[in-house]
Amino acid sequence: MEEFVNPCKIKVIGVGGGGSNAVNRMYEDGIEGVELYAINTDVQHLSTLKVPNKIQIGEKVTRGLGAGAKPEVGEEAALEDIDKIKEILRDTDMVFISAGLGGGTGTGAAPVIAKTAKEMGILTVAVATLPFRFEGPRKMEKALKGLEKLKESSDAYIVIHNDKIKELSNRTLTIKDAFKEVDSVLSKAVRGITSIVVTPAVINVDFADVRTTLEEGGLSIIGMGEGRGDEKADIAVEKAVTSPLLEGNTIEGARRLLVTIWTSEDIPYDIVDEVMERIHSKVHPEAEIIFGAVLEPQEQDFIRVAIVATDFPEEKFQVGEKEVKFKVIKKEEKEEPKEEPKPLSDTTYLEEEEIPAVIRRKNKRLL
């Protein structure tokens, strides 16, 4: 049997405690075809991980004790060891950078690593996790500020909100299971990209297509759905285009997509056409869609749809029960007049760029 090898070099870097945990989970799950790295300022946390490639940063500034929930310390730690980071990124085609936002190392160091990767010509995708609502508005404010920096430093980014875990299952999740679900998002995103690139296909999709879709793509959605039976097309598309784990959670309005369909050999062309029509109806009318198709001879009455969607006209985030929209300001656009900002509360979140630093400090004192 012919063995297919991934022609592109993909690395996954977990930054800080949350990001490193996600990468460690991938290592324990035995993901293949990628190199895994955990980067942290906290030596004790690194020692608990099984992933082989563990890198300490910021020894001088943190003495191995962590960043103390201060993003500026995490940033300084990354800059202290920038040569070490560049060495890790050498000979890389694509990098996923995973970080939990709202703390110190992930929030501060991840944007530095992403910026370095992008400057080296590497396709850079950030996978960022926002904190639970019960962690308070101050941590969320810090996380959103870190996300802004990460957005500017990456080609594309995927945002997960911890509070959305409860939407994944009807059963009661344990704490361990809940965080496993969060960690699995990174794994599924990486597996999705690698499977698209290396799987022999009737209509092939290669790494150049992945780059076309994700490069400078901004907010991204990666969805996958499977279906069988009479309603298989509806089921597969609905699962693929709606991702409750992810912020934005819909492909509506996307202007760049990569769609791969796996089908059993008994599936008629009409079903594939129906799937693509349904996807077309949900995205921008002039969206650029790269299409791939894979036959699954061992399956029967089966269809799977994988979608990578980017280049959205507006970024939508769900924070607690409030939807917050972040307008994507293009260079040719002008910002609309700003309203007088209001103090933050546990139920109200303002756009980070709309709050002057002096007001933010005042609001923090009011809390």
Swiss-Prot record:
Q: Name one Pfam family in it.
A: FtsZ_C
Name of the featured protein: Cell division protein FtsZ
Q: Where does the signal peptide begin and end?
A: none
Species the sequence originates in: Aquifex aeolicus (strain VF5)
* Record InterPro entries: Cell_div_FtsZ, Cell_div_FtsZ_CS, FtsZ/CetZ, FtsZ_C, Tub_FtsZ_C, Tubulin/FtsZ-like_C, Tubulin/FtsZ_2-layer-sand-dom, Tubulin/FtsZ_GTPase_sf
UniProt binding sites for GTP? G17, G18, G19, S20, N21, G104, T105, G106, E135, K139, D183
Q: Which family does it belong to?
A: Belongs to the FtsZ family.
This protein's major location comes to cytoplasm
Cite a single GO MF annotation.
GTP binding
Which superkingdom, per the lineage?
Answer: Bacteria
Name the keywords, alphabetized. Answer: Cell cycle, Cell division, Cytoplasm, GTP-binding, Nucleotide-binding, Septation
Subunit architecture: Homodimer. Polymerizes to form a dynamic ring structure in a strictly GTP-dependent manner. Interacts directly with several other division proteins.
Its localization reads: Cytoplasm
Which gene is annotated as encoding this protein in its UniProt record?
ftsZ
BP GO terms, sorted: cell division; division septum assembly; FtsZ-dependent cytokinesis; protein polymerization
Q: Which SUPFAM superfamilies match?
A: Tubulin C-terminal domain-like, Tubulin nucleotide-binding domain-like
The record, for NCBIfam families, names:
ftsZ
Q: What is the lineage of its organism?
A: Bacteria, Pseudomonadati, Aquificota, Aquificia, Aquificales
Tell me a GO cellular component: cell division site
Instruction: Return the PANTHER family for the record.
Output: CELL DIVISION PROTEIN FTSZ-RELATED, MITOCHONDRIAL DIVISION PROTEIN FSZA
Q: What's this protein's function?
A: Essential cell division protein that forms a contractile ring structure (Z ring) at the future cell division site. The regulation of the ring assembly controls the timing and the location of cell division. One of the functions of the FtsZ ring is to recruit other cell division proteins to the septum to produce a new cell wall between the dividing cells. Binds GTP and shows GTPase activity.
